[in-house]
């Protein structure tokens, strides 16, 4: 790889690292496994850099598949840490995280991984249905149905979390 290609690759990775890490985390639910998945995907991308026509979609596809592979490992299933908290990408200060943001994260982690990946690609990454289907290696209809089911599950979970907060507030007021 010549210097121009190396520079282009470094710029690409620098601009998209947070997004790729988030995709991997949303897919596998563990930051350590997500880091491994991103690293493995970027190694493969680096080796194929000159031949890749659409590096954004290629990188997202590779990261998604690597994250899925990480979740399939038997050691992952046995040693998954309980309650692995999702750190705030924009701010490392946990005090700056709002209650609403925490509620949304909790609700999102309750959505099944496939639906969570679709929601992330469609609504956080802003991919079209076809682009998300390419990344996930499925049909556009699958993306549509998974997005609809994922949004319904997310709404249901957010409603449940909201109602439990209202009950806690009511109980606090009665004391």
Residue spans for each PLM region:
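Internal acidic/polar
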Residues: 69, 77-101, 128, 167-174
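C-terminal edge and immediately downstream basic/flexible tail or linker adjoining helix-turn-helix-like DNA-binding
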Residues: 8, 152-175
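A short pre-motif secondary-structure segment
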Residues: 118-122
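DNA-recognition helix of helix-turn-helix
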Residues: 54, 68, 136-160
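C-terminal flanking helix
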Residues: 17, 21, 42, 112, ...
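Short amphipathic alpha-helical boundary/capping segments
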Residues: 11, 103-112
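Arg/Lys-rich amphipathic alpha helix in sigma70-family domain 2
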Residues: 47, 54, 61-83, 96-97, ...
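Short, charged helix-capping/linker segments at alpha-helix termini
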Residues: 1-11, 21-40, 48-53, 140
């Amino acid at each position: 790889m010549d210097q121009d290609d190396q520079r282009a690759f470094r710029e690409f990775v620098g601009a998209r690292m947070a997004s790729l890490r988030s995709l991997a985390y949303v897919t596998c639910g563990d930051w350590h496994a997500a880091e491994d998945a991103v690293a493995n995907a970027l190694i493969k991308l680096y080796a194929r850099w000159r031949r890749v026509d659409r590096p954004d979609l290629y990188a997202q596809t590779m990261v998604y598949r690597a994250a899925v592979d990480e979740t399939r490992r038997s050691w992952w299933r046995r040693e998954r840490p309980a309650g692995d908290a999702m750190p705030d990408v924009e701010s490392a200060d946990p005090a700056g995280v709002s209650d609403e943001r925490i509620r949304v994260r909790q609700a999102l982690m309750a959505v099944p991984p496939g639906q969570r990946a679709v929601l992330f690609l469609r609504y956080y990454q802003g991919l079209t249905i076809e682009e998300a289907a390419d990344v996930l290696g499925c049909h556009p209809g699958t993306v549509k149905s998974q997005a609809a089911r994922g949004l319904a599950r997310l709404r249901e979970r957010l409603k449940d979390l909201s109602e439990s907060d209202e009950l806690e507030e009511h109980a606090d007021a009665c004391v």
